[in-house]
Design a protein with these regions (language model features):
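Bacterial Sec-dependent N-terminal signal peptides
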Residues: 1-28
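Thr-biased low-complexity repeat/linker tracts and other Thr-enriched repetitive architectures
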Residues: 130-132, 149-151, 168-170
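Short, surface-exposed interaction patches in beta-rich subdomains
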Residues: 158-162, 173-279
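Detector for intrinsically disordered, low-structure N-terminal pre-sequences
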Residues: 11, 143-145, 202, 214-215
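Calcium-binding motifs, dominated by EF-hand helix-loop-helix domains
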Residues: 106, 127, 146, 165, ...
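Acidic (Asp/Glu) and glycine-rich low-complexity loops/linkers
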Residues: 19-128, 136-147, 155-162, 174-176, ...
Length: 279
């Protein structure tokens, strides 16, 4: 058995070494894109960083991978990807793009990443993450839509009138939120670690998904005036509310709250419960 494990480990290391060797040494290339864009689509595990110190798009990749890098503008969309049926062969794919105040939509897939210290600002901001992609940025808008799947992660504060969060497949979001309306839909073991203040909170949690417990100054960190919605499949939520809570819980789900909210009209079945806590 030990011999088999040794052989397997050797083969894995050889394969990784071969991939890195095939990718070649890192090289950098500039891409000039004419015209503005409002949408960014990134695929194939590119790591994108926004900078105000550059005026062209700069890509770093293995010298044998670089010919397969595609940076193109289609209409209002900037798309960064590899050519179809090609591979990075173990090469890190890094991109630096100039700061663009007009950017209002970010779409990441295939374990891609987006990093910006400047924030997205507009009337409506859309963020779509799939395939274990990661987003690091603050968002300011009238309306914000975040759609995440496949163990993707979002790290950043959101300030908007309306926020719609839809997470599935063990995705995670973490940040400070300020909104008039916050709609949270979590499924498939997804988690939201949120702090902040919202007027209207709607929760739809299923499949062991959670609004994670976070305590600030002897209360739960996510504050709302009113909360309604459904929770099922062993999901948990922790909120602070001084207004009203009207929820339907099933399948061993639990809603924990601090504050003086009235829970009249709520319904709990299947071992579910609403708990008034004092952290």
């Amino acid at each position: 058995m030990r011999k088999q494990l040794f052989i397997l480990s050797t083969l894995v290391l050889f394969a990784l070494g071969s991939c890195q060797k095939y990718a070649g040494d890192p090289v950098t290339q500039d891409f000039n894109i004419e015209g503005s864009y409002t949408e960014l689509q990134v695929e194939n595990a590119f790591e994108v960083t926004v900078s105000d110190a550059v005026d062209v798009i700069t890509v770093t990749a293995g010298e044998n991978v670089m010919p397969n890098v595609v940076v193109e503008k289609i209409g209002n969309k900037l798309r960064i990807r590899l050519k179809t049926l090609t591979s990075a062969y173990g090469s890190d794919l890094k991109v630096v793009i100039p700061y663009n105040a007009d950017l209002t939509s970010v779409d990441l897939s295939d374990a891609s990443e987006f990093h910006s210290e400047y924030g997205l600002d507009g009337q409506k901001i859309e963020v779509e993450l799939s395939g274990a992609s990661e987003f690091y940025c603050e968002v300011y808008a009238d309306e914000v839509d975040v759609d995440m799947s496949g163990a993707s992660e979002f790290f950043g504060d959101i300030d908007a009138d309306e926020i719609d969060l839809d997470l599935s497949g063990a995705s995670k979001i973490e940040g400070y939120v300020t909104a008039t309306e916050l709609d949270i839909e979590l499924s498939g073991g997804s988690d939201a670690t949120l702090e902040g203040q919202v007027a209207e909170l709607e929760v739809n949690l299923s499949g062991a998904s959670n609004i994670i417990e976070k305590v600030v100054e002897h209360r739960y960190a996510l504050i709302c005036d009113h909360c309604e919605g459904t929770m099922s499949g062993g999901s948990d939520a922790y909120i602070h509310c001084d207004g009203s809570i009207k929820v339907s819980l099933s399948g061993g789900s639990e809603l924990h709250y601090t504050g003086n909210a009235a829970t009249t009209g709520s319904d709990c079945t299947g071992g579910s419960a609403i708990s008034h806590d004092v952290p």
